[in-house]
Amino acid sequence: MLEKSWAKTFADKVFPAIDENIFSVLYSEKASRPNTPVNVIVGALILKEALNVTDDEIVEAMAFDIRYQYALHTTSFEEQPISDRTLSRFRARVLSYETEHDVDLIHECVVKMAKEISDFMDITPDKQRMDSLMVAANIRNLSLLELFYTCVANLCKIMAERGAKIPDEQHHYIEKDDYNKCIYHKRDMDATERTIVVMKDADVLIKVCDSTGDFDDTSEYQLLIRLLKERTIIDGDGSRRLRQKDEVENPSEVLLNPSDPEATFRYKAGGKHLGYVGNVVESVGEKSSLVIDYDYQQNTYADNQFMKDYLKEKKDFCDGSFIVADGAYSGEENSRLASEHNLKLVTTNFTGRKPDEIYADFIFTENGQYLLKCKNGCIPEECKYDPHNDCSIAYFKTCECENCPYKKRCNPRFLKKRVRKEVSWKSVGRAKQLQYMKTEEFSEYAKFRNGVEAIPSLLRRRYHVDKIPVHGKKRTRLFFGFKIAALNFQKLLDYTNSLASYASNKKTA
């Protein structure tokens, strides 16, 4: 039975691909008490996401379910090496190391595993596609009143825990049911007036804390300071007031909920999103596909920056390699970076203003700064480069432009003695992209890209990426990494099952 279960594939292909040496930095080099094998811990965390179980259920399953023991190579152990705190302590170690050294060990491990698994699945990195997905933070979108109240109440509670004296007028923040009284039951003032009252209470508490300096090390104090800085302003007379909506600086990056201070806000596809954004790179073979790399940032991170980061980290690709993504990943710099790595970048949507297609036949110098020839074959008398607008300013003879068949589409500026035309290399590249989008080859690339849309859908439906039970970018990124590994395991399982089915059918025939 084990030979036909998921445990066989995991034990033979996934478990051996887990590189324990990556995590050696977490442990002492001195001989000491033996620790739980790291590959067992990492394997258990992958199975946790793949089978949608909790930490406690994994521990129980390893004690009583032979499939888990077989998958993690622990059948010969007299006692299973995982306890109720093993997984949480390992995650804490990894996060502590990342905070101190800015190195994501889980990402390194998952990417290396994907490389080994892709070799078995005969998937090469010459056909890639990229997509991003919004990952919801496990927080509520608080109103401004709720946000101020929560931050003030949190500071009051930590002051009470440390035995500090809370002013009488602010003492009610630590009383039971005060939140409901202030937010829902106090109807004699509107929400803005109540927010101003809480803001003034915050000012009083900050002054009390500043006088002693005993709370500078607390997140509650720091978050309240941040909130006052982002949402209030001090006028010339020294009084503090709430900022108007247009006065808020970087509204996408302000504090949304003290439970997750790193979560950001973004409008995308007509919806409001609080949290983070994941980016996945999928490599496609003849029979299957695999996520070979991923990234995870605050959701204000641009898609074209994800592409730029990915290309900068990669070495040269083999001839004929390409990567396909939607229009948000486009950009002249990204195309240049891809070309430097022998990779063709194809973006399937066109974003921004569309230039006239006649610009596709304009010829520039190699550095893209000077126009050499226009669509009609005319050579400018004089040409300058405008670094401020990153464009070329060319001057042509009046007689050439007056008789040009493309005059209306080009729309140059006629001066007294000559004609001025401003055009950038970016416009030429975008015009060439428009022409290319009408070809049959581009149509095939667009169909190829559509397949990557399944990844965000799977991560949401099967792996519950929007319900990660922790807060903060580093913590949620750790869970995201294991979900990617679980997704790859499922793809591997489907691949091995297809091979077994093919072999069975061949034998029957």
Task: Kindly label every feature range from the protein language model.
Residues 31-35:
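Short basic-aromatic helix/loop recognition motifs at nucleic-acid
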Residues 38-39:
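Double-stranded DNA-binding cores of transcription factors and transposases
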Residues 65-83:
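Short, basic interhelical loop/turn and adjoining N-cap
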